[in-house]
Amino acid sequence: MATLILLLAIPAAVAFPLSDPTAPWVTAGAPGVAPTIDGVVDAREWAGSVPLTGFTGVNTQELSSIQPTVRVARDAAHLYLAVHVPLPGGRSPVANARQHDGAVWEDDSVEVFLDPGHGHQEYFQFTGNAIGTRLDARGRDSSWNGDWRFQARAGKGSWSAELAIPFATLQTRPPAENAVWGFNVCANIRGLGSSTWSPVLRSFHEPARFGHLRFSTTLAAGVETLAGLIDGGGEIKGVARGTGIAMRWQLLRDGAQAAEKRLSPAGEFTLPVELPRDGRFPAAGRYSLRVVAERAGDKMPLMRLAADHTVSAPLELRARAFVNAGRLETEATVQAAGLDRASLACRFALAPEGGKPSVTREAALTDGRTVRATFQKAEVPEGKVSVSVTLLEKGAPIRTISKVLDRPLSPPWLGDRTGITDEVPAPWTPLVVRGKQARAGARGSAVSVRPWGRDYQFEGGLFPASVTASGASVLAGPITLRASRAGQ
């Protein structure tokens, strides 16, 4: 007897070929001296490492507002990683999981994924939170336990971690020259969600979407900070060690090229970035940064980064009318890149259209981005109203925007009863109720309720005793409710 076996493989995600221009690359240099794994990222101990950053949200290439910095190093027996994670608002990290292989990902934590064979099937996960609790897994099998070290150090406004992962625990030899591993680093930040170095689509467990970690004894390249793009201007910094390295970076705005530069870095490099300006502010738009470092004759890049960043308008205004409550609420959102937020305030004003302001409110940026002001009905001019907000820096105006509202608290429909009727339009029929309902829970009451096309008979209970539709009974029997507690 012959047997035909059909194997159907459905990939979890579209794989990154080595040539994919959106796949991130980083190259770790020659083996060096092992750092002390204590959670303190000492610049001297990590001097020979290669940095990486450019974290984005899951299923998007949009840069995250919080950008961790990762450093990668190695010696003859280990891969080493250091991670520094800034935290919003200067807060301290939050971590509750204390049991090995517990829900570490729910805390402020970092996750490292390694696919030494780069076959998109076998991979390892190493996760740790801000108090040093670990989770390790082979693929999704968390019963696997590896021999590796992890230490964390918490601070106010940030935390850091260091990892030492033996090549032996990855069941592989030390990487050969120009070997390429599947690689990703992810960060979980309480209150902000998760971010990833390599742009996965649905979850961190997508080895086909891991980035590329290249190993070399003579070359190294990576990006350390993208502050120049995120802040609307400044510098992008990184490292490119080795001879013959050529770097190219492009900046696109809404799909059109805004800037392009080429350089031949040697060691640490700095790329000046200046976004197009709208007065004192970076011009609004969706920016795409593409950076690649390569060497002539190589088939693989040394470093590649592709990231998007949306710059919103510097000042946005919204207004909501609460007609019944008789108030108008205004809200301004400030994108104050490059400005001292402590010196900023917003002045709201109402005026008859084309006229002078009749009432103003002024408020400082208390939460860093949003300012609100409320106006009562007596303060709101009749007819068309001009609502404006002016951004102030140390009391001096630097940007004003406005919008016109038409009778926001006395709209034309207020008090109009057009369309309000107790009559039920055809083909629907009015609800008919017959019988007298007794007090709740009493026996013997009988009520018939006839909505459109059905007849519900109630006989003193919560559920109908019968339901009739088109002359036919719908219920096969009475509806009963049974409840039990502790088996009784």
Outline where the language-model segments fall.
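Acidic-aromatic substrate-binding/catalytic surfaces of carbohydrate-active enzymes
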Residues: V50-T56, D107-V110, S410-T421, P425, ...
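Beta-strand-rich binding/interaction modules
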Residues: G234-R262, L289-V291, A332-V334, L339-E362, ...
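Beta-strand-rich recognition/accessory modules
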Residues: W159-R190, G255, T366, R450-R454, ...
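Low-complexity, Pro/Ser/Thr- and charge-rich linker/hinge segments at domain boundaries
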Residues: A220-L229, L305-E329, R399-G435, R439-G441
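Bacterial N-terminal signal peptides
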Residues: A2-A13
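Structural preference for beta-rich elements and adjacent junctions enriched in aromatics
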Residues: A15-T310, A319
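Solvent-exposed, conformationally flexible loop/turn segments
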Residues: G32, N178, L229-G233, A266-T270, ...
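Extended acidic/polar, glycine-enriched regions
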Residues: A266-E268, F281-H309, D367-G415, I420
